[in-house]
Amino acid sequence: MRKSEHKLTFMQTLIMISSTLIGAGVLTLPRSAAETGSPSGWLMILLQGVIFIIIVLLFLPFLQKNSGKTLFKLNSIVAGKFIGFLLNLYICLYFIGIVCFQARILGEVVGFFLLKNTPMAVVVFIFLAVAIYHVGGGVYSIAKVYAYIFPITLIIFMMLLMFSFRLFQLDFIRPVFEGGYQSFFSLFPKTLLYFSGFEIIFYLVPFMRDPKQVKKAVALGIATSTLFYSITLLIVIGCMTVAEAKTVTWPTISLIHALEVPGIFIERFDLFLQLTWTAQQFACMLGSFKGAHIGLTEIFHLKNKNNAWLLTAMLAATFFITMYPKDLNDVFYYGTLLGYAFLIVITIPFFVWFLSWIQKKIGRGQLQ
């Protein structure tokens, strides 16, 4: 097989970005947004989507100009060994944190709804072990997993939300800015984590067949997930009210569980949601897991990118961290902290780009 055939196409890149963004938020976003008491979470999602698209379009030219290198390599070249090491370590720890958060949510949902008699530790370990297997297979194999799962997920989710629309009441999402602007902007930290995922572009650019299309792929990927989350939140709140959504652990599942469609013999629509979401949530972990793998390979200068010791250590570390939170309240608290860590992560390309610009000005530039 020719080398070019292993490169990611525009559509594969777009699907990877969208799939990594769409995960736990499908089930937990309505509750997180409802905790502020504002029914305008869907507007905050749209606003955040626009903000993050602008941020990405600002730092992508730096990655495009050096499309043969991941951000991990750029950090080491521009910032030097020590600072580059710290930056790369932070990104890796962040990616691992995201994987653990996603894996714990996956374990909680599967254990509660699908495998009630199976210990959650067993469920989590199996999913992490399968994920590590895919991580060892490389970026292209992960892209193929995304390509199979994402379209099915999108179609089934949209169909279920359309069926739910018959329960929608406009009064439940009004007034739009109830509680004033302070209440509206208090939504920002609550919904921040659900935009984590597009950072996989830090390492994806060198794997693209045509890096010139990266801006379009990432912008459309973020836009797709933004619309998906906004519609999900709008319909769930519009069917359940804010007061009910914040008292239910998994509002989306509760809504679909209560769904009845006349003329259709299917009674448990929530099973379709749970099964497709489980596959999507698993796929969502892969992008961040691979990011941590590539970063650690760079940090430890490993020639064998599929080093068995590294993959085993990653599996063990993520498993124990995933099982550390005592309950769901702890999980959601750590999720909020990850949201703030996400803000720091997306400043790193700007910091390295600024250092590179200074080096060029003083005649020590090593990059384009």
Curated annotation (Swiss-Prot):
Instruction: Enumerate the subcellular locations listed in this protein's record, separating them with semicolons.
Output: Cell membrane
Q: Which NCBIfam families match?
A: 2A0309
| Main localization of the protein described in the UniProt heading | membrane
Give the GO biological process terms: amino acid transport; spore germination
Residues passing through the membrane, by range? 10-30, 43-63, 82-102, 120-140, 145-165, 187-207, 217-237, 282-302, 308-328, 338-358
Q: Which GO terms describe its cellular component?
A: plasma membrane
Q: Which organism is it from?
A: Bacillus subtilis (strain 168)
Spell out the protein name for this chain.
Spore germination protein B2
Gene3D superfamilies (alphabetical): Amino acid/polyamine transporter I
Q: What protein family does this chain belong to?
A: Belongs to the amino acid-polyamine-organocation (APC) superfamily. Spore germination protein (SGP) (TC 2.A.3.9) family.
Mode of membrane association: Multi-pass membrane protein
InterPro entries tied to this protein: Spore_GerAB (IPR004761)
- What Pfam family does this protein match (any one)? Spore_permease
UniProt keywords (A-Z) are:
Amino-acid transport, Cell membrane, Germination, Membrane, Transmembrane, Transmembrane helix, Transport
KW RNA-binding (keyword) present: no
